[in-house]
Amino acid sequence: MSEIQVETKGFHCVDNAVVYDLTESMIAAGYPMRTNTKDLLTTSIEGKDIDRAISLSKATLKGNQAHDQFLSGIRIAFDLRCSNKMWVEAERYRFLTFVSSQSTMHRITKFDLSDQYNKYVDSSIIAIMKQKVAAYNYLLEKDDTNPETLKEKYLEILYSNPAGFELTARMTTNYRCLKNIYKQRKDHRLPEWREFCSWIETLPFAHELILCDA
């Protein structure tokens, strides 16, 4: 199985990225035209394999949506940091899968809030959130605090938290899903979607297989 470490330097939203099975999946794109079983055992990619894979991926531009199925075999895992606003939209992609993520439900009162909000969150709102967290933690340390009061205060914090709060999650997906994301989000209003799409452009064979502009 091929494994490629992907550069993420210069991108705020992505880290620790690895691409798997790029070579194997590009070779497999030619399976429908092969009749000799021994031909399927090769792990050495040739120019004709690359050309066919690129041609099949570009065929979707003409409406042949099934021809790029092999892209689903090119898997990629990465850490994604983005706002609650972007996470809500990211969850619509069926094949963009959460491995694990940070949690406001469990740890909202433990975060350093100064590092968690993007630049679009009003500083006065951040100050209010810090006050609410400080008040909760103060009550938590007191022996005589009513448990129901703590529950209510915690819910106040959860529901008051603005959309610009950023969380990091380990994600896994494939090139076919990224192709769909890129098409739909490259000019999105949210800058973090645009940054993510800019990072997609740097992936191995991205221009040939995802953007289809090469």
Protein language model regions, located:
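Family-specific signature for flavin-dependent thymidylate synthase
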Residues: M1-A214
